[in-house]
Design a protein with these regions (language model features):
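Helix-start (N-cap) detector for alpha-helical repeat units in TPR-like alpha-solenoids
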Residues: 6, 39-40, 73-74, 103-107, ...
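Register position in tetratricopeptide repeats
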Residues: 18-19, 51, 85-86, 116, ...
């Protein structure tokens, strides 16, 4: 196709998209693909279908491109990312595995897919493969962050701490990494060490309920019962579901401050959720 004609049609597509005329843009893109078949046009059309909610149509466009050029990796990588965005984890893994030897970034995406499927051991394997084959880039530090989360879920707290510290090189100002660090220190009973990351997480994202929960847990262990009360109360206000454990922890925070009526109320709330929860039953009994 003549270059000037191609530029004109691409400008026309941009104009239609700006005006919200997506069907017009799709028609022109389909015609351009028939005439030139360039990779970027397939990608643009797939993303346009995706933006309209036609995920399967976008996937078909990308599969058509792969069928035309099965030896080329880029369309497969793009399809893998596309499937990932749309939570089609198993299909993403299948596509990306076909290029894992030639495209290191696919290892990261496979690992992420396994993590979302809660296949943590497989996720670890692929994240570690990615780290070995990647340079010192931001994605490597992101892999360390995810490995910290995975190791925490597997109760491997020492290795979770190591990965979290590695991720700090770039992600020190990311609230979730600070929360992971605080949770790991809490699980290792290193409560004083947990203070700095939980404070940082609170500063970075004061509206995140899970940060309030762990702030309450940490301050309770440090016997700062007033702060424990405040953060646990905030967590309860922000949450639609609260466990008997959290109600009991708040009740104990009140009890340590000799606020017996408040303690009784929250022990009872805990027992309403789980009548067999012994810490709440024992706490209420102590008030008799």
């Amino acid at each position: 196709m003549d270059e000037d004609k191609l530029k004109y049609k691409l400008k026309l597509i941009s104009k239609y998209l700006a005006e919200g005329k997506k069907l017009h843009a799709i028609q022109i893109l389909n015609n351009l693909i028939d005439e030139s078949g360039t990779e970027e046009l397939y990608f643009q059309l797939a993303e346009l279908y995706e933006s309209m909610g036609f995920v399967d149509s976008g996937k078909k466009i990308l599969l058509d491109k792969i069928e035309l050029n099965p030896e080329v990796d880029d369309p497969k990588l793009f399809l893998g990312q596309y499937l990932l965005r749309n939570s089609q984890w198993f299909e993403a893994i299948e596509v990306l595995n076909s290029i894992s030897n030639s495209t290191p970034s696919s290892l990261f995406l496979i690992a992420y897919s396994y993590m979302m499927l809660k296949e943590f051991e497989l996720a670890k394997e692929y994240f570690n493969k990615f780290i070995i084959h990647s340079g010192d880039n931001e994605l490597k530090h992101e892999a360390n962050f995810y490995l910290a989360k995975i190791e925490y879920e597997l109760n491997h707290f020492d290795s979770a701490l190591e990965y979290a510290k590695n991720a700090q090189y770039i992600y020190s100002d990311f609230w979730e990494l600070n929360l992971v660090l605080a949770k790991v220190y809490y699980s290792l009973e290193m409560y004083t060490h947990a203070i700095t990351p939980i404070k940082r997480a609170l500063q970075l994202n004061p509206k995140e309920a899970s940060i309030k929960e762990y702030a309450g847990r940490i301050y309770f262990k440090l016997e700062d019962f007033n702060k424990a009360e405040n953060y646990l109360s905030e967590f309860i206000e922000m949450s639609s579901e609260v466990s008997a454990e959290i109600y009991t922890l708040l009740a104990k925070s009140f009890l340590k401050q000799r606020k017996k009526e408040e303690a009784k109320l929250f022990f009872e709330l805990a027992l309403n959720i789980d009548p067999e929860y012994k810490p709440a039953a024992n706490g209420k009994e102590e008030l008799q």
